[in-house]
């Protein structure tokens, strides 16, 4: 039986293993024939969605890995808009709304309210938090 998963990532791209472990879990789930419809980045996890993260050449680029996984498997990548704004991760729409000249939300990520997380909790067979 194939299950539909949603993931919640609370850890930042670097300084914590949460995002890396969530990514590895996602790969394993997909390899077993299940699907992931949404990854919701919350609290410090929104830092995974910054286009300004520049890891060293010998380090894993977890943001790029999330982007590629999402493209290959049609997974929604959402950040909590309130948590993102507090941490300086700004989408184009929010930049315009707040009259900012720049935005730095990485390609493939969308900003959403906690309603996005609530939807995941109700729609999916499993929701796993990292």
Curated annotation (Swiss-Prot):
Listed A to Z, the keywords are: Cytoplasm, Transferase
Task: Give the family per the record.
Answer: Belongs to the DsrE/TusD family.
Q: What is its EC number?
A: 2.8.1.-
- Cite the active-site annotation: 80
InterPro entries linked to this entry:
DsrEFH-like, Sulphur_relay_DsrE/F-like, Sulphur_relay_TusD/DsrE
Please explain the role this protein plays, according to its UniProt record: Could be part of a sulfur-relay system.
The protein depicted here goes by the name Sulfurtransferase TusD homolog
């Amino acid at each position: 039986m194939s299950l539909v998963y949603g993931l919640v990532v609370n850890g930042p791209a670097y300084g914590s293993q949460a995002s890396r472990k969530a990514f590895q879990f996602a790969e394993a789930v997909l390899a077993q024939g299940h699907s992931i419809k949404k990854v919701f980045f919350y609290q410090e996890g929104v830092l995974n969605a910054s286009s300004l993260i520049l890891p060293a050449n010998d380090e894993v680029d977890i943001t790029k890995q999330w982007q590629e996984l999402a493209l290959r498997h049609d997974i929604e990548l959402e950040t909590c808009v309130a948590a993102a704004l507090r941490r300086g991760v700004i989408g184009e729409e929010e930049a315009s709304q707040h009259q900012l000249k720049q935005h730095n939300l990485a390609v493939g990520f969308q900003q959403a309210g906690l309603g996005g997380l609530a939807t995941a909790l109700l729609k999916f067979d499993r929701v796993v938090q990292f």
